[in-house]
Amino acid sequence: MLDAQTIATVKATIPLLVETGPKLTAHFYDRMFTHNPELKEIFNMSNQRNGDQREALFNAIAAYASNIENLPALLPAVEKIAQKHTSFQIKPEQYNIVGTHLLATLDEMFNPGQEVLDAWGKAYGVLANVFIHREAEIYHENASKDGGWEGTRPFRIVAKTPRSALITSFEFEPVDGGTVAEYRPGQYLGVWLKPEGFAHQEIRQYSLTRKPDGKGYRIAVKREDGGQVSNWLHHHANVGDVVHLAAPAGDFFMNVAADTPVSLISAGVGQTPMLAMLDTLAKEQHTAQVNWFHAAENGDVHAFADEVSELGRTLPRFTAHTWYREPTEADRAQRVFDSEGLMDLSKLEAAISDPAMQFYLCGPVGFMQFAAKQLVSLGVNNENIHYECFGPHKVL
């Protein structure tokens, strides 16, 4: 554990960190990628370009400094990051590289003196050991499961199915013909790619979209404007191609008893982890109320509508409601949605009034903030609201 002097020294730097903001982590990443360019094969460079990862790292550093006397308060964040790290196959020696560049960044930007650098070195060492220990546990758990594996494993694309104008699903089965590890509904799969034309290896996480079956995996990918990986998958990946996958991971998952009511609330491609949850609830014959609330721009980009309806018909207590923000004339003629405009949960208050109900949210951050605010205003306990951010985590 850290001594009182080290803690006091680290906490004394908080005002400087806050004043500097993400400029600190921008300098850190620029320095690290200059001296250790091999790490570009691991980090999501798209998140570097748009600044999301720099902001996320700064928030993590500031949170650590603020809670250095209360490390248990950081454990939920540690779990989220450790799960993601295993999908990137982060190794203990890479923490030494990060530590070196973090201390060098503090020195180059602030010239704080050796006492401060030594204190931050000790503090970083404690945090790094927490991550290394937890990630070793996750790696062991993944390798020890039936159908589990270490590192990455080659899988063949056995199905590629357009689901909307923007979303395509991909099904994978292992090249070795063996079984595959189970996962919790809501978790994601690590997809490792370096096809011809890519400057660096690219690693992405995509939510698994159905109940585990031990035979293979299914994900669904939204084609993003300018998205290197999503566009390659949509336009160039074909049935028969081989990709490498890291084992399922993630701290966002559904774990409820059969008599626990559930609401699955999503927008756009945020429905993907919800599909795995709904599929699981349906196949396990969930007896309590299940709600499926989904928002989409219109019918052209609304994926998996038929699958959701089919699964819903197998549940004894199922309510579905779909909002289209800007429905097309065809949508209005066919009446394939329930409400026009933004999601308004107050109209469905009776369906979400059970105090035991668990709420799972996924979609753009602004949407989740909007939905969570409505839920709280309707009397839902914050502890019953669970959410997943695609990309670096943000607090709602």
UniProtKB/Swiss-Prot annotation:
Tell me which residues are marked as the site Influences the redox potential of the prosthetic heme and FAD groups.
Answer: K84, E388
**EC number(s) on record?**
1.14.12.17
Sorted keywords for this record are: Detoxification, FAD, Flavoprotein, Heme, Iron, Metal-binding, NAD, NADP, Oxidoreductase, Oxygen transport, Transport
Tell me the ranges covered by the Globin domain, including all copies.
Answer: 1-136
Q: Which residues form the FAD-binding FR-type domain?
A: 150-255
Residues marked Involved in heme-bound ligand stabilization and O-O bond activation (site) = Y29
Q: Which residues bind NADP(+)?
A: G268, V269, G270, Q271, T272, P273
Q: Name one GO biological process term.
A: cellular response to nitrosative stress
Give me the ranges of the annotated region Reductase.
147-396
Extract the GO molecular function terms from the UniProt entry: FAD binding; heme binding; metal ion binding; nitric oxide dioxygenase NAD(P)H activity; oxygen binding; oxygen carrier activity
The residues the record assigns to binding heme b are H85
List of residues binding FAD: Y188, R204, Q205, Y206, S207, C389, F390, G391, P392
- Could you give the cofactor binding note from the entry? Binds 1 heme b (iron(II)-protoporphyrin IX) group per subunit. Binds 1 FAD per subunit.
Cofactor field: heme b; FAD
Catalysed reactions, semicolon-separated: 2 nitric oxide + NADPH + 2 O2 = 2 nitrate + NADP(+) + H(+); 2 nitric oxide + NADH + 2 O2 = 2 nitrate + NAD(+) + H(+)
Q: What is known of its domains?
A: Consists of two distinct domains; an N-terminal heme-containing oxygen-binding domain and a C-terminal reductase domain with binding sites for FAD and NAD(P)H.
Provide the family line: Belongs to the globin family. Two-domain flavohemoproteins subfamily. In the C-terminal section; belongs to the flavoprotein pyridine nucleotide cytochrome reductase family.
Record function comment: Is involved in NO detoxification in an aerobic process, termed nitric oxide dioxygenase (NOD) reaction that utilizes O(2) and NAD(P)H to convert NO to nitrate, which protects the bacterium from various noxious nitrogen compounds. Therefore, plays a central role in the inducible response to nitrosative stress.
Q: What is this protein called?
A: Flavohemoprotein
The gene name on file is hmp
